[in-house]
Structures are given as structure tokens and as C-alpha cells.
């Protein structure tokens, strides 16, 4: 019998480093259907969010701006282009988004999820990090002997062949990064990645049986 898993894949852009305001959040909620042999049957986006907020800080961080180009003028423009109902000006006031992150059944996924989790300020029950889980998959040499560095999103995407080199210029947009992370997760499920299947609740015995040929 097949089982449907709810995945919440997300990314944020901020006004600086840890503890600063969230300027944008992008979320893709996906139903992943997996059969009893742990084959991925379908990977369907149910709903997505792409929202922009103002910082509570008095200034926009120059270093962060260089990465994502979000300032008051651009945020004004992007909020005006939003076609759905209006939403709060500040991230921590957005109850609809907060309710998404309060889901106790979903698996929350991000690249470097520890960083994003701190910004949300809501305990996430089940999480998975595409960065940490792929360090030993990509095996990019780390700074010390016999270590691997944590791969960047672009490095992970290139490994799973879900990005072309000429697409690099569009990075640091939360919407694009979320879509790219979703493609990485799709590839990982297709290949029956053990860490991801474990995060979804499958037992060691189930995974062993499904990965034997």
C-alpha cells in the first residue's frame, strides 16, 4: 500500500546574520507518494507561498543586500505584485505562515535548515537538511584531513543534475532556492536515499529490503 508524506520545503532571505529579520520566505508544500517498495510514485506540489516583509531593524544590511537585492523599494514593488489576499508587513506577524510551521505531521526540509529554523522561532517537530545529509554523498574535501565540507545548494543541485551552470546568476532568491531544493529532494527520493527515508519514518528493515537488488 502506498503512503502519502507531507513535505514542507522552504527557504528564507534575511536582513543579515542569525537573529535578523526575515525579508522573504518561500514555501512549497508537497505530497510525496511512496509505495511499499519505497519507490516514489508521485511528487505533487499542493500549495506554495512567496512573501516579502520589511525589517524591524532601522537599516537594511549592506552585505545581505548584495546577496538578495532586497531593499524597501524592491519589497514595496514585490508586495504590490502579490495577487492573493494581503498579508502582514512583518514576518513574525504572519499567522498564516506561522501555522504552516506548526504542523506536527509534516517533514520540514531546507538547505542548512538549522539557520532557517532559528529565524522562524517555532519548534519544528520533524526536520531534514539537504546540506548536512549530502556532505558524505558529494564528498567535497573539507579544511581538515579526512573531512568533507558542507555542500552549497548549487553544488548539491549540480550533483543531482537539476541545474545548469548558466543558471547560477539567479541564486539568493528564496523562491528559486526553494524550487531547487524541491528538485534535490525529488532526486533523493527517486534514488531511495537512506537518510531521507529514515526521516520520513521508515524503519531500517524496510529500507534494507527496498534497497536490495
Task: Locate each region found by the language model.
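Active-site-proximal helix-loop-helix substrate-binding element of RNase H-like nuclease domains
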Residues: 59-77, 135-179
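Active-site donor-binding loop signature of nucleotide-sugar glycosyltransferases
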Residues: 53-54, 130-132, 162
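Ser/Thr-centric signal marking residues that sit
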Residues: 12-15, 130, 181
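Acidic, Mg2+-coordinating catalytic module of metal-dependent nucleases/exonucleases
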Residues: 104-114, 119, 152-213
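Conserved non-catalytic scaffold segment of RNase H-like nuclease domains
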Residues: 2-124, 154-159
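Conserved beta-strand -> loop -> alpha-helix junction used to position metal-binding or nucleic-acid-contacting
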Residues: 125-139
Amino acid at each position: 500500500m502506498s503512503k502519502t508524506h507531507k513535505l514542507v520545503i522552504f527557504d528564507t532571505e534575511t536582513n543579515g546574520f542569525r537573529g535578523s529579520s526575515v525579508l522573504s520566505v518561500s514555501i512549497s508544500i508537497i505530497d510525496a507518494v511512496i509505495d511499499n517498495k519505497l519507490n516514489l510514485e508521485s511528487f505533487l506540489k499542493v500549495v506554495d507561498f512567496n512573501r516579502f516583509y520589511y525589517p524591524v531593524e532601522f537599516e537594511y544590511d549592506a552585505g545581505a543586500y548584495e546577496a538578495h537585492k532586497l531593499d524597501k523599494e524592491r519589497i514595496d514593488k514585490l508586495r504590490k505584485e502579490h495577487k492573493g489576499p494581503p498579508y502582514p508587513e512583518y514576518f513574525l506577524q504572519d499567522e498564516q505562515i506561522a501555522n504552516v510551521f506548526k504542523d506536527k505531521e509534516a517533514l520540514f526540509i531546507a538547505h542548512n535548515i538549522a539557520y532557517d529554523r532559528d529565524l522562524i522561532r517555532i519548534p519544528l517537530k520533524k526536520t531534514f537538511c539537504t546540506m548536512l545529509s549530502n556532505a558524505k554523498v558529494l564528498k567535497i574535501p573539507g579544511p581538515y584531513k579526512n573531512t568533507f565540507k558542507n555542500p552549497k545548494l548549487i553544488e548539491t543541485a549540480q550533483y543531482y543534475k537539476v541545474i545548469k551552470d548558466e543558471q547560477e546568476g539567479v541564486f539568493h532568491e528564496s523562491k528559486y532556492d526553494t524550487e531547487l531544493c524541491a528538485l534535490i529532494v525529488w532526486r533523493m527520493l527517486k534514488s531511495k536515499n537512506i537518510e531521507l527515508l529514515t526521516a520520513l519514518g521508515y524503519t531500517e528493515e524496510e529500507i534494507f529490503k527496498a534497497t536490495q537488488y
